[in-house]
Structure formats: C-alpha cells, structure tokens
C-alpha cells in the first residue's frame, strides 16, 4: 500500500522498544527482573482450567491498539496510512472466522481497546481490568508488538490469561510468562546465537578480528549480553571489548556523552566489528558518534531491538556511511515486496497472500495516499490477520471444552503455521516463540537504482532503499 520510491521494499512499521519501561515496571510490579538463569517455565499441563471470558456462545478477546490521538499514534498514522486501518482489519478477520461458524460454535467477541503507550499507570489498570474485572477476558492478542515488555507479564504471569504477542525479547521472558505467553516474534536468544554463527562464517568475527559490543545499561540489554551473547562468543573463543551507553529514554544528555566515549574507545582499540545491543534511543546517538568521528566498523545487526529494521529508515540520511551495506540476521521476511506476485519473485509468502486475498475482496479500492490496495508485507493488516488466525487455530484445536489449559496445550501442538512477519510458526511444550528460521539481509541505498532492490509495479519508480537478501533461510539455533 505504501508509495513506492519513498520507502524500502517490504518495509515494516517501526517503533521503539521501551527497555527502560520494561525494567522499571518489572520492579514496580513485584516481578523478577529477566534473567538467563530464571526457573523453568510452568508446563502447559499445569495451566489454570479457568474458562473466564468464555460463554456458551462467545469468546471475549482483547485487541490493544495505540490510541490514534496519542503522540505516537498520530505519528504512525502520518507516516503509514495502513496504520489507521487496524480497526477495519480486526473486524474483517474476526468476521471471517465468525461467519464461517466461529470456533466450535462460539463467536469471537472483539474488544478493541485504545491506550496511550506513555501512560504506564493506564496500561497497568487496563491489564488488571482484563484479567480481574468485567467483562471477563479469555485472551489478549497483539498483532503489532505494541503491548510490550512488562505489560505482557501483567497479562500472563500475574493474570494467568493467554496472550499471543508480536513483541519479543529473550527466552527468560517467556519463561516468566509461561504457559500463557506465546510470541509470534522471534526469541532473541537464538537470534543472537545465529548472529554469532553467521559472524564467524562471514569473517566478521574471529579470524583475528578485534570485536566490540556496545550495549545499553538497561537491565534487559545487560541480561541479553551476559546471559546469552557473551556465552555464545565464549564458545567460539571471542573475548570482545564491551562499552556501555545510558539507555533510559529520559537520559538524552548522558546517552549522547556515553556514545561519544564508546566510539572513542572502540576506535582507539582498533575494533573492526561491533555487535550493538541498543534500544533505538541509544542506537541512533551511537551511529551519530560513529559518523562524527569517521569510524565505520562492520556492524552485526539483527532483530534484537529491531536494529536491522530501524537501520533501513536511517539511510540515505542521516547515517549513510554508518549503515549502507551493513548486514544482519532476521527471522522476518525482509527483502520482499508488497505485491501478490509469486513468493519466488519476492512477493507475498502464503500466509500474507491469504490475508491480502480477504482484504482485497472486502476493500478493493485504493486508500487515499497510496497507489494500490496491496497490504504491506510487514504491516498492520497482515499482523492482525496472523494473530487472529493463529488464535482461531489453537482455540479450535482446544475443542468444545475451551479453557486456559486446553488452549495453551493446543498452542503447544501447533507446527508449520503459515506466518506473516515470519514464513512459518511452530511451537512446542517448551517452545513459546514461533519463528524457526533466519536469513541474512543487507541494508542497501538504491541511489542510483540497481537490480539489487526488487521492483514494484513497472509503472512506478524503483525503491529508494531496500533490504537485499544475502543468505536465505536457515534453521534458527536451539535456544
């Protein structure tokens, strides 16, 4: 749906990950901070048998949306017309399920709830209302990854309510939320392991290279470093130089100063390859410091904190030299285009194509500001489509006796589900994140136009930037 030439092919909507809010909330709400040494997840066989939110004819399901009147909501709508289509998308795909007979005779009752992502107290109150108040709620679905961090744990760990969520971090988070928290986004633990493996095989790590890690001081990033990345590097005999940057969103001056010092240290040490573990509010100052000091090491980007996605939006300005040509690991279908052409030609994968077919039939007209009615390959419409159909699959498998235990047991049996952001989703009794594969992509500035970026409609100009697939799908390492 986006205008070709103004964005990269297959671009997804981006938003910051509130690492600082995640950690603050975990402490304030009495939850354990994430730790790689967390206790084993609660088995699905020990889930609650409560059927709260389920009646003889309906299933109450919450769909949280960032308020369109909030600052972030207004920004998203201005930058992406499809973002404003979310309510239509939710009703369309819920109606598709209900009109086909529902789930074992029950209809999904969609409860679409707007929230301000900057209002922590409001989010906490909403969570408690859903999990303890009226009307009762059976499940929460988040197709875009906006109900993030500790909010996931409020619903699942505290509220014992099933949640399907696109926002993800490392394995310890689903351990805390088990057996109710199920991610459609990739677990970052195997993503980091894949980053190290690819780094070694591509010559970016090892082979005499000096390696650095730039990480924020936020507890979630420190845990990713110490519990996951450092052990992965140790296995291949790499001892990196680690530099830390302030990562809280309200520490702008400290972040800028730390970024400058971090680059000075890495440059002075002759570091050639850098693995960033940074939220975007620290990632961009770090790139600015690289640029101002004319220091451009190889960056090993990844889905961690959405760095590989964010990077595409930062070229050709302001960080062309720092990012153009950099590569990274992703479990998402980056590198395709927003067209219902064959997948082999860069078009929709089967899951997204099925979503587009339903959307196109209902809304064949071209939305204002777009050139066609094609949905974004990584956009809001397919995100909600994926989450709703995955929920319906598990709820149907749970049978007539739908309760929390039968639902999560059904989720643990789902394999090879056609995904949206990722091609395939597979789960298990102790596998709470669906993606199973990763690819390596390059951030590419397409000025002047080249054949590296897949073309959209022939009548439209080529994309200005794109992800170029450098290595296609391989299995993610076991987490």
Predicted features, each with a name:
Residues 40-130:
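N-terminal extracellular/periplasmic Venus flytrap/periplasmic-binding protein-like
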Residues 185, 290-384, 470-476:
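Extracellular/periplasmic periplasmic-binding protein-like sensory domains
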Residues 368, 372-375, 396-409:
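Short, charged, surface-exposed loops that flank catalytic or proteolytic processing sites
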Residues 18-30:
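Bacterial N-terminal signal peptides
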Residues 43-48, 52, 324, 412-479:
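Solvent-exposed, acidic/polar segments of extracytosolic/periplasmic ligand-binding ectodomains
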Residues 47, 84, 99-178, 184-185, ...:
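Beta-alpha junction/loop-to-helix N-cap segments that form part of ligand/metal-binding clefts
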Residues 27-47:
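C-terminal region of N-terminal signal peptides and the immediate post-cleavage residues
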Residues 137-244, 298-327, 331:
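Extracytoplasmic ligand/sensor domains, especially the bilobed periplasmic-binding protein
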């Amino acid at each position: 749906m986006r205008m070709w030439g103004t964005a990269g092919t297959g671009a997804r909507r981006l938003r910051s990950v509130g690492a600082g809010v995640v950690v603050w909330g975990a402490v304030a709400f009495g939850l354990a901070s994430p730790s790689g040494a967390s206790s084993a997840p609660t088995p699905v066989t020990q889930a609650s048998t409560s059927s709260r939110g389920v009646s003889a004819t309906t299933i109450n399901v919450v769909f949280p949306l960032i308020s369109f009147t909030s600052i972030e909501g207004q920004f998203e709508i201005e930058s992406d017309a499809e973002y404003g289509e979310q309510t239509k998308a939710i009703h369309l795909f819920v109606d598709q399920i209900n009109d086909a007979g529902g789930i074992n005779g029950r209809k999904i009752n969609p409860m679409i709830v707007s929230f301000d992502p900057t209002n922590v107290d409001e989010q906490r109150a909403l969570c408690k209302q859903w999990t303890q108040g009226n009307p009762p709620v059976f499940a929460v679905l988040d197709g875009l990854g906006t109900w993030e961090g500790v909010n996931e744990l409020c619903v699942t760990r505290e509220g014992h309510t099933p949640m399907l969520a696109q926002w993800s971090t490392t394995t310890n988070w689903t351990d805390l939320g088990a057996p109710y928290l199920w991610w459609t986004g990739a677990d970052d633990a195997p993503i980091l392991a894949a980053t190290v493996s690819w780094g070694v095989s591509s010559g970016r790590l090892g082979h005499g290279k000096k390696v650095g890690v730039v990480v924020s001081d936020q507890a979630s990033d420190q845990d990713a470093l110490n519990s996951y990345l450092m052990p992965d590097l140790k296995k291949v005999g790499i001892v990196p130089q680690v530099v830390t940057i302030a990562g809280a969103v309200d520490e702008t001056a400290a972040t800028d100063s730390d970024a400058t010092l971090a680059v000075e240290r890495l440059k002075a040490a002759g570091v050639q390859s850098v693995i960033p573990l940074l939220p975007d509010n620290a990632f961009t100052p770090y790139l600015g410091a690289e640029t101002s000091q004319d220091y451009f090491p190889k960056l090993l980007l990844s889905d961690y904190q959405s760095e590989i996605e964010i990077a595409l939006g930062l070229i050709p300005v302001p960080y062309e030299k720092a990012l153009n040509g950099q590569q990274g690991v992703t479990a998402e279908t980056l590198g395709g285009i927003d067209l219902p052409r064959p997948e082999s030609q860069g078009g929709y994968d089967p899951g997204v194509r099925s979503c587009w077919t339903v959307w196109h039939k209902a809304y064949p007209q071209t939305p204002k500001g777009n050139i066609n009615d094609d949905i974004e390959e990584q956009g809001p419409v397919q995100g909600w489509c994926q989450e709703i159909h995955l929920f319906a699959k598990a709820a149907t498998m749970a049978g007539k006796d739908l309760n929390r235990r039968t639902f999560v047991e059904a989720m643990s049996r789902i394999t090879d589900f056609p995904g949206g952001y990722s091609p395939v989703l597979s789960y298990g009794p102790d596998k709470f994140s669906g993606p199973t594969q990763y690819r390596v992509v390059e951030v590419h500035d397409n000025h002047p136009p080249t054949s590296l970026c897949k073309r959209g409609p022939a009548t439209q100009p080529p994309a200005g930037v794109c992800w170029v697939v450098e290595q296609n799908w391989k299995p993610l390492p076991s987490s």
